[in-house]
From Swiss-Prot:
CDD domains: SmpB. One of its GO terms (biological process) is trans-translation. This is SsrA-binding protein. The gene is smpB. Coiled coil: none annotated.
Length: 149
């Protein structure tokens, strides 16, 4: 498994509830561009539309050696999941405050591009501050134990 890009903001801004591995429908120049340049998750999210899941605002840069048939960098991309998984995601999305975000995009062992998506709930600012405080105290305890043995 070769990771192309990860969504680092997902773990700081959201509480991750469930994760799913999904295939993604791409054109040839997008795959070539992913191999060369990677992707950007800035403001990307998923939406369920007519029984299908679509990934929106995932930026895949244009392929440098492409011609006039190069892809649109911000186009909506269809995700491939089983119907039961889509229904489970849709039932969670009906609840207040839940959203579906991409967390990782990677090549699996067969060379196929996969996207890890997560059902997440947004964190409040005080939740983020509490998490930062916990990390700092854990770091201080670790340093204290390291130097005072």
């Amino acid at each position: 498994m070769r990771i192309i890009a990860t969504n680092k903001k997902a773990y700081t801004d959201y509480i991750i509830d469930e994760t799913y591995e999904a295939g993604i429908v791409l054109v040839g120049t997008e795959v070539k561009s992913l191999r060369e340049h990677g992707a950007s998750f800035k403001d990307s999210f998923c939406r369920v539309k007519e029984g299908e899941i679509w990934l929106l605002n995932l930026h895949i840069p244009p392929y440098q050696h492409g011609n006039i048939y190069n892809h649109d960098p911000e186009r909506p991309r269809k995700l491939l999941l089983h119907k039961k998984e889509i229904d489970r995601i849709w039932s969670k999305l009906k609840l207040e405050g839940y959203t579906v975000i991409p967390t990782k995009i990677y090549f699996n062992n067969q060379g196929k591009v996969k996207v890890e998506i997560a059902i997440a709930k947004g964190k409040k600012s005080y939740d983020k501050r509490e998490e930062i405080k916990k990390k700092e105290t854990q770091k201080r305890i670790k340093e204290y134990l390291k130097y005072n043995r």
